[in-house]
Amino acid sequence: MRYKSLLQIILIVSCFLFTTIGFGCSNNDQSGKANECFDDPDLPLVEKSASGDSDLSGVSIDLVTYDAFLPPEGAFESFTAETGIQVNLLQSADTGTMVSQSVLTSGDPVADVMFGIDNTFLCRGLTNDIFHPYIPSTIEQLSSELLLDPYHRVTPVDYGDICVNYWIDEVAEEPSTITQLTSSKYEGQFVTQNPETSAPGMGFLLATIAYFGEDGWQDFWKDLRENDVGIESGWTESYYGDFIAGGGDRAIVTSYLTSPIAEFIYAPEPLETPPTAVIADSCFRSVEFVGILRGTDQPLASAMLVDFLTSTYFQELL
């Protein structure tokens, strides 16, 4: 199965999960809408050529993203110097919250561009028509495998792996497989995120479905609950709240494949090795997208920001 096809299946499954846990995939909350992820939105493309001579100096646009996103230092200042467009960063609690707020304000958005909706929440965004189609000038530089939406409502901007992390010195025995999370050895040690509001949380849920299958994943989650799993609303709350990295008392957390390296690089004192590691079979590939929010008053400036965020210059800064 080609990677693009697999990602599209993940979108459908994610949307179905939202309907089954109470989050509809369309404005009227009908559970049969999962197959509408890639329906024609019947909206015209944003065309930069139509206003190519416009002077955008002094224009200000809002970029909404999740709270853990840290823009590369000086990146937006560079964009402003080049275009005259000022970028204001609005940070939501987590991906799920960001998407939910955008669904509620679809057509009259609180921001102009969204950065960070991923493949676990994308179906919900697409079926609720929160994006305006736009083909970025950088499209030829992007991987065709990640161009999931044939109508170009979103553009891939980043990808990585969601994985269960553990603090090496704080577990009785280093876990090597996802099945061990229900062992009494790790009772009260694991914290993850609510899949209704958090992209890492949804990614971990989908990883368990992939691992245990449709007949086994619910039993696994039942066992997790009996083993005192912690559930937080978002990544920040779990990683810097419950997890040892933030002063908490839980030694296992859903985070990212790159988290051990980050712990190593940003440690207050030099380390010889990272203090954390990942459980390899818990990982789930997350693809993040950027898109122009439908109803923006600044479609041209928003399109230029999408071009910038998907440019080689910005990508090398990430």
Predicted regions and their residues:
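A structural signal for short loop-to-beta-strand junctions that line the ligand-binding cleft
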Residues: 52, 109-114, 132-164, 179, ...
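Early extracytoplasmic/lumenal segment of secretory-pathway proteins
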Residues: 32-124
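Ligand-binding pocket segment of bilobal, Venus flytrap-like solute-binding proteins
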Residues: 207-282
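Short beta-strand->loop
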Residues: 64-67, 131-140, 150, 152-156, 166-168, 179-182, 257, ...
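Bacterial signal peptide processing site
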Residues: 26-28
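A bilobed periplasmic-binding-protein/Venus flytrap-type ligand-binding module shared by bacterial periplasmic
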Residues: 165-170, 209, 286-301, 317-318
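Periplasmic-binding protein-like
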Residues: 188-197, 308-318
